[in-house]
Amino acid sequence: MSLLLKNIVLPLAHFTLAVDVEVRSRVTAIFGPSGAGKTSLLDLVAGLRRAPSAFIQLDDRVLTDTATGRLVPTCARGIGYVPQDLALFPHLSVRQNLLYGCKSGAAINPLFAFDHVISVLEIAPLITRSVTALSGGEKQRVALARALLASPQLLLLDEPLASLDEPLKAKIIPYLARIRDEFRIPMLCVTHDRLEALTLADEVVVIAGGKVMQAGPTLEVFNRPANPEVAKFVGMETLQPGCITEVHDGLATVSINQTRLTALAPELAATEVFVCIRGEDVMLQREAATASSVRNRLPARIKALRPQGALVRVELDAGFPLFALITRPGCAELALREGDAITALIKTPAIHLVPR
């Protein structure tokens, strides 16, 4: 799939959405914080909003071109859309909601046949029920099925997991993956959920304040953020200004206050950098670290322990604020307490340097 979004200019309440990007992957995540303009961009692709300037092309079909006045109606775009509120009809049964989305005609792709769709999403037992009697996860699957029954060329998903609790999210993600693999339909998925983006998307477009901050393969964006804003969005718990004092054999020595770290040298020549470290890449050790391949071994003191579900966020003073994410059993085995001295270990490739 090729989706070209060019010369997009849409004034919003607090900023102007301004986008120029082309996506070619099967599943692309529009990723970023709430209120960044992600849903507005999705609405433009669906034809639900008009912009003073926009050129939108899906493969070889121009859907919107404000320069020529072309605007293909929403119903003729060949797009399935699952909005965040799902937009199911509460006065209709599940079957009636599904039939509302069915595409008629002899040229329907067998992949999108009614029986096949409800089988893949496992909603046959729900067919006769009222949508008001469904759980959040069941409603999500019905909304996905209705969008697929329109036999779309592109599927738009707006925060498909946002309204679900963690157990339900874990149940819905496999269905989204099944849609990706079974129907092989291009998907554009708006999300601010890291797990959702990492699990489903081939490419990520990071948007903040109405602008594209970075776009590219998912792992590349998550592992090599282009700037501090992207680093925060993709989950770099530690983000500190530093200075490169030496580069040798592809390794950079970085100084943060009086603390020295070894990292992979950035491709761009820069001395002033932001040091980005994920919490899960920081290991903790009670005794002083013995000889190992880990280059960064920092004496630190525990400032706070903050439980986060199955994990504990450990706030450290290592000469600079450093954050570690460890499991609850790991925290218990180390008998961690506030004020304790600890050694933090960070492998060289886990320290990402972003020019500032």
Across the structure, where does each feature detected by a protein language model lie?
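ABC nucleotide-binding domain signature
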Residues: 29, 71-73, 77-87, 188
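Walker A (P-loop) phosphate-binding loop of ABC-type ATPase nucleotide-binding domains
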Residues: 33-37
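ABC ATPase nucleotide-binding domain helices that frame the ATP-binding cleft
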Residues: 39-42, 142
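Helix-to-loop junction immediately C-terminal to a conserved catalytic motif
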Residues: 46
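Glycine/charge-rich catalytic "coupling/switch" loops of P-loop NTPases
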Residues: 50, 258-309, 323-356
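Conserved ABC transporter NBD signature motif
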Residues: 54-66
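ABC ATPase NBD coupling module
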Residues: 63-80, 104, 221, 225
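ABC ATPase nucleotide-binding domains
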Residues: 84, 93-229
